[in-house]
């Protein structure tokens, strides 16, 4: 427990401000800034502030919020609103000019508008409205979300993906470059507009290259009226400031680590972790930057929304000192409440927990740490409101101070998902309610069966660099290996235009042929030839598929697989027995599933619902997917270096006549390859030619 707390004494043993002075206070008299220069004048009355998660708006009433046009409001009795956000994406820097004397210990300068402190290490970043994380979107179900994305980055196109939102009415707003839209070029603006549904905890992030890890992400929360929230009886408060984004952080731009280094700084691991964009490095030489505080009251129960905003392969452990975590939702869907000591968070995960603040008023550590060989931590503070004066800080915890205990989603310690083990798998958890159509989702015989096997392809130097074929294939140097990544022995290549919104056929030589035995049976890997193509699997609209995600690779990586456009119902998770042939195991597993299918609605009536499913090394997950959302939907590993080197594919759900058409004027793009006529320029008289 933290006793006699004062933040800066933690490292410097000098007088400092009370932590109470650092915290934002809810202010019900706020007025929103209208007529902002960055906003569309026609929408200025709908503009939302950048600091929703600051605590300033936590206690505002529905009536007061709607009076000033604030979309972050209690949703009981709320009228649908237009919620407009104007975002400028630009090259920026941590502890830059806006921070003044922050690094010299002036905490008021650290809190200046435009000051991004991160962990106090100065580095270039990418930012949304000069914030990390980017502005939080918090609205009520049924609102209309409008986001103008202005790309002011010097050398980068971009898109924004709304992670976990189905986009049923607006598939062209999913934000995947060259799949659902053209990238947003530098100097242009793209308007995302979609209905706020379903309710739950989501987040937004760039889906272009490695930009997400350099700062382009933020929270997105859609609430329903409390009277309609089936898990609201578990908590007293669901505050806008109690949204937590966990991120891994490098001290250089992420693309400086791609495709990898051979001689210096070769690791693709984080240098730090951030909690809501902040951390204070535990070193005598560390800069004087603040950490994040979350304010609570004794004997109250608070809903916290935890977002796995990390990008790299190392999972994060989340814990709150002396406070168990009551899990009530995952990836936006309620679950039967259960208690754990820690959360194991993978990239893309979201977990809602209730913290019962029943301790004596004080301050308690919130910690995130990696589970990899080099343990890196970030700390924040759970601060009880109290009349006592806060003075000094106690010892900061090291990486082993808090035991892991019973941990949710701990695929590293319980990959077989055995019962009675401290590692709890999602397949062992029940959703709060059965599927809306249990006889469809859990039908005895699925309409389709797919196996999605993830693996890596190891290049030889000769094949990649010296073989005289003038091919330039993507690779990632995971020193000493040089690899790319695959699903079903196919390394994904982006199409030359977005197939969702442009009906031109993709060139046949770019599409993975479904009957290509050289890709399907794996002989291409053994022979050293890579299948690199646009991998699309077609599914009938309304079909229910049984999908087996399985790791056929030889690495020690865990793969958080994310599906756009719909959810997965987790039926089973486990580990492939050692020494068993991959195909033989798949056949055994499918035979078992077929045998048990007749009773699935009885034996597994409330499967957990998620859009991110993590596969451990040599592990698997069996899921049911109801493909009821027409369009082109990405499925990919959320480890950023894996997805960007081929561990992706597309589900085409339905046919073009079943697709929802994009709005008029929707941007188009394609390769430009005009015909070449040898005589085209012969008739031109050049100024430098003799007459």
Residue ranges of model-derived segments:
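Extended terminal and domain-junction accessory segments
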Residues: 18-95, 210, 214-258, 336-558, ...
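A cross-kingdom feature marking solvent-exposed beta-strand/loop segments within repeated
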Residues: 170-189, 288-290, 326-355, 528-533, ...
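Asparagine-centered strand-capping/turn motif at beta-strand->loop junctions
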Residues: 149-154, 306-311, 549-553
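Cleavable N-terminal signal peptides of Sec/SRP-targeted secreted and luminal proteins
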Residues: 2-19
């Amino acid at each position: 427990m933290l006793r006699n707390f004062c933040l800066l004494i933690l490292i410097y043993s000098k007088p400092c401000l009370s932590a109470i002075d650092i915290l934002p206070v809810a202010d019900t008299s706020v007025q929103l800034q209208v007529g902002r220069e960055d906003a569309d004048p026609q929408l200025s009355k709908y503009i939302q502030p950048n600091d929703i998660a600051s605590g300033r708006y936590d206690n505002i009433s529905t009536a007061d919020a709607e009076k000033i046009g604030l979309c972050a409001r209690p949703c009981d009795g709320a009228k649908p609103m237009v919620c407009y956000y104007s975002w400028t994406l630009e090259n920026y820097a941590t502890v830059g000019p806006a921070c003044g004397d922050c690094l010299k210990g002036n905490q008021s300068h650290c809190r200046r508008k435009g000051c991004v402190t991160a962990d106090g290490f100065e580095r270039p970043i990418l930012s949304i409205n000069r914030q990390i994380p980017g502005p939080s979107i918090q609205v009520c179900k049924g609102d209309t979300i409008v986001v103008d994305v202005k790309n002011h980055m010097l050398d980068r196109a971009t898109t924004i993906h709304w992670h976990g939102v189905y986009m049923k009415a607006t598939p062209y707003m999913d934000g995947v470059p060259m799949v659902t839209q053209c990238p947003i070029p530098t100097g242009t603006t793209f308007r995302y507009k979609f209905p706020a549904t379903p309710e739950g905890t989501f987040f937004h992030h760039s889906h272009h290259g490695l930009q997400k890890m350099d700062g382009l992400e933020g929270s997105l929360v859609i609430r329903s009226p409390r009277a309609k929230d089936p898990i609201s009886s578990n908590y007293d408060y669901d505050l806008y400031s109690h949204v937590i984004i966990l991120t891994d952080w490098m001290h250089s731009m992420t693309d400086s680590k791609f495709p990898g280094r051979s001689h210096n700084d070769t690791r693709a691991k984080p240098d730090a972790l951030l909690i809501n964009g902040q951390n204070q490095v535990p070193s005598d030489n560390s800069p004087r930057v603040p950490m994040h505080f979350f304010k609570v009251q004794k004997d109250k129960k608070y809903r916290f929304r935890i977002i796995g905003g990390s990008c790299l392969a190392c999972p994060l452990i989340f814990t709150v000192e002396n406070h168990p975590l009551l899990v009530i939702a995952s990836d936006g869907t309620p679950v039967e409440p259960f208690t754990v000591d820690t959360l194991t968070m993978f990239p893309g995960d979201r977990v809602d927990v209730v913290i019962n603040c029943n301790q004596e008023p004080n301050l308690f550590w919130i910690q995130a740490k990696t589970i990899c060989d080099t343990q890196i931590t970030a700390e924040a503070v759970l601060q009880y409101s109290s009349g006592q004066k806060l003075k000094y800080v106690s010892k900061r915890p090291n990486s082993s101070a808090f035991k892991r205990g019973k941990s949710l989603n701990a695929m590293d310690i319980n990959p077989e998902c055995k019962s009675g083990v401290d590692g709890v798998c999602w397949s062992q958890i029940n959703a709060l309610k059965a599927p809306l159509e249990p006889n469809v989702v859990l039908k005895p015989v699925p309409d389709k069966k797919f196996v999605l096997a993830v693996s890596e392809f190891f290049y030889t130097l000769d094949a990649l660099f010296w073989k005289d074929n003038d091919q330039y294939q993507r690779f990632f140097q995971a020193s000493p290996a040089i690899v790319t990544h695959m699903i079903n022995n196919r390394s994904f290549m982006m199409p030359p235009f977005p197939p969702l919104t442009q009906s031109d056929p993709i060139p046949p030589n770019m599409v993975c042929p479904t009957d290509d035995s050289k890709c399907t049976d794996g002989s291409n890997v053994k022979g050293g030839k890579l299948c690199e193509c646009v991998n699309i699997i077609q599914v009938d609209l309304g079909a229910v598929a049984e999908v087996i995600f399985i790791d056929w690779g030889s690495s020690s990586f865990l793969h958080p697989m994310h599906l756009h456009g719909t959810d997965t119902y987790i039926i089973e998770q486990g580990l492939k027995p050692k020494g068993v042939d991959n195909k033989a195991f798949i056949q055994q597993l499918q035979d078992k599933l077929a045998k048990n299918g007749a009773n699935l609605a009885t034996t597994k009536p409330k499967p957990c619902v998620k859009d991110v499913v993590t596969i451990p090394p040599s592990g698997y997950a069996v899921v049911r997917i109801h493909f009821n959302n027409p369009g082109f939907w990405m499925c990919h590993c959320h480890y950023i270096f894996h997805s960007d080197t081929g561990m992706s594919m597309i589900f085409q759900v339905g046919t073009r006549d079943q697709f929802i058409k994009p709005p008029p004027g929707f941007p188009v793009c394609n390769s430009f390859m005009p015909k070449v006529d040898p005589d085209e320029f012969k008739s031109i008289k050049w100024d430098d030619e003799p007459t």
